[in-house]
Design a protein with these regions (language model features):
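A beta-rich soluble binding module of mature secreted/lumenal proteins
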Residues: 2-191
């Protein structure tokens, strides 16, 4: 019972810090002919919704690898400069085309994971939305294969978000810092 209450409380904290607006979740056009195998590997987070309490630091990475049962192993990391450590969260995801569901905790509901667009070798734009009665909580991530990207790529990503999710408030998007004092996972995984 206590564990269930804790999971529910954490979920509500996440909802309380998302970009919340009225209405139901949209159904944006997702990446056509999504190829999960090409999507696997290391991604650097370049931007995200600024209200995510569990992603409060910089130096963010996401690693995806296929499991033998067809699910996807997810390993997200961020550097915590106060503790001088890399924090890691693991999850399992399932995909049906470009629409996925990610579960970080056994008893927590799976989170929405929609690939709006990707070229697999340079960038990916991910959208998530959960409906709650008359409101919705939305999140956005811009991922890249390279640690550093130019403003042209970011401008293009923001334009794609504007076109595919026109009512999403882009003022909530926060750029992620890389380089400098960043520390990353020191592991190499086959993908």
């Amino acid at each position: 019972m206590i564990k269930t209450a804790l999971v529910a409380a954490l979920a509500m904290v996440g909802v309380a810090n998302a970009y919340i607006s009225t209405g139901q979740c949209p159904t944006p056009t997702l990446k056509a002919s999504f190829d999960a195998v090409k999507y696997m590997g290391l991604w650097y987070e370049q931007a995200r919704d600024g209200g995510m309490p569990w992603e409060s630091n910089d130096c963010q990475q996401a690693r995806y690898s296929l499991n033998t049962d067809g699910t996807v192993a997810v390993k997200n990391s961020q550097y915590d400069p106060v503790a001088d450590q890399v924090d890691v969260a693991t999850a399992t995801a399932t995909f049906d085309g470009a629409k996925g569901a990610v579960r970080f905790f056994e008893y927590a509901p799976a989170g929405d994971y929609e690939v709006l667009d990707t070229d697999y070798s340079t960038f990916a734009i991910v959208y998530s939305c959960s409906s709650y009665y008359l409101a919705k909580a939305e999140y956005i991530w811009v991922l890249t294969r390279e640690q550093f990207v130019d403003d042209t790529l970011m401008f293009s990503a923001l334009q794609t978000i504007r076109n595919k999710v026109p009512n999403y408030d882009q003022t909530s998007i926060r750029r992620t810092t890389h380089g400098g004092s960043c520390k990353y996972l020191n592991e190499v995984q086959p993908y």
